[in-house]
Amino acid sequence: AHYVRPDSAIDEEAKKRGTSVYFPTHAIPMLPEALSNGLCSLRPGVNRLTLTCEMQLNQDGECIDYRIYESLIKSHARLDYDAVADFLDSGKNSISNKEIQKSLKLMQELMHLLEEKRKRRGAIQFEFSESSVEFDHQNRMTGMSKKFQSSSMKMIEQFMLEANETVARHCVKRKLPALYRVHQPPSDLKLQQLKKTLAHYGVNPKTVSLSDSYGFSRILSHLKELPQFEALQVVLLRSMALAVYQTRNGGHFGLAAEFYTHFTSPIRRYPDLMVHRALKKELSSRNQKKSSRKRNIKQKHGEEIDRELALKCSQQERNAEKAELQSVDLMKCVFLEPHIGVDFQSIIRSLDSRQIRVELEPHTLEWNVPLETLNDDRYFFDQERLYLSGRRQGRLIRIGQRLKLKLIRVDVLQRNIDFDFEGWLN
């Protein structure tokens, strides 16, 4: 916020972009390279201007006091997630500095406190793996890989969540003109359908409440023991609303948080930059006396300006996500084009009324295949039981079913791949 002044050329371009976009091979930053990888990027031994949210937590991980202030910090080391995870998980000497080791152990202890606090509160903790494109030394795609969130990533996530909640609470208390990250509860219609589905998997909708995130968390814990857990996670996720930016705090259902905003990434998200501006403006005017009337008028005016911007930031976030997914699909097409005519053993990862999503072995590459491709029968999707049912033969197709597909066509420009169905494998 110190370098990106309101209404400057850099600010207008950042507002237009709304967010940085991350492709498998490169990123398109929201801010110019000189800022995103230069003046605003931490480097060991170099002073950097920062905005600090310093929190005091009790033994239960609850924030009992905090202070937000402008600061100057000097990073002691550049650490990477894998090295820190190796040290935290197995005690490997991937981190040689003893002082840093001591700090990481303390941070790990704090992470567990924060995790337990959010668990008690009812925060919903999905367990999805994240797919990433693998490359060779010539930057050519060799396949896909799946990884679950590492301990080091979980640690940073918990710290960011705590900072975001604390700053959101502060902005509401001080009536600052900021954007909030709001996640509404699921709609009644989606809850009704979800209850019907869960009833087939041993969850009695009459004994478990879905009116709050704590109920969702309890259900998720129950479903972990089932072989269909991965698919049921998707069902739960799809029943929930999308998180959006708004000018008023509305809480975050998934995190079971009463207050929530985005504060921790002002380099790559415009809403975070706006929050930083509001905080810096408050800090600079803290010693200036202003009438409550003037402050209230200014706040109302700010809300009128920001409401349209909040909608735009939400839309730009969706656009970035869509672009990232399409870029991965494009790379999959380029990768598979030389394999036209090849048979692939595949496994169904998810399904719905229009298509099955299969994972092609051995590349861990997923693609959507239309139901019409399964030409041995005419299949219908049972939304409550989560399987496909063949009208003529009565075959039931569930997630985890293996099949053989032949790659017959790849259109790189249209990002489209077609298969022929060769038969079921089990």
PLM feature segments, named:
Residues 326, 381-391:
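Short, structured beta-strand/loop micro-motifs enriched in basic residues and often containing a Trp
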Residues 390-398:
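C-terminal structured domains
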Residues 1-380, 400-426:
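Electropositive polyanion-binding surfaces
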